[in-house]
Amino acid sequence: PRLSSAASDVYKRQELLNPNSTIKPKEVIKIQLNGLQKNDSKFKDSGIEQTWNFAHPNNKRVTGPLSKFKMMLKSDSYGMMINHLSHTITELGSSDKWAQFEVIILDKNKIYHKFNWQVEKYTLDGSLKDCWLTTMVSSPIPLGSSI
């Protein structure tokens, strides 16, 4: 028997990656960007949910709940991240507690956008202890067309 779409989504949600202490700062951003690049690959908005999984709790307090986070990522401010064509991630600086990256996204309209992306190591006890999580993504800086 086929699973209902709701049951299927629950099953597919288990395929999303969750933070663990072995995932390095740049890999966190890569996981988030790869999800957003193929936003509906596992189920509708699976990429946004993948990104949400690696958001720092302090970030989630400001941008959440998930339904609000989805609307924010689909807004004019961040919509170019959804189903973008390609991205590059360049480390700008880091310590043992934080790392800052420049992310350049080529959107589906072939326009480049630059973001500053920051991750921090979660230090409190619990399942997220020592995991790298996204604390801040800047507003996009348009860099113009690729043509």
What are the language-model segments listed below?
Residues E91-I147:
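Exposed beta-sheet edge and beta->alpha loop/turn motif
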Residues L16-S21:
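TPR-adjacent "capping" and linker segments in tetratricopeptide-repeat scaffold/adaptor proteins
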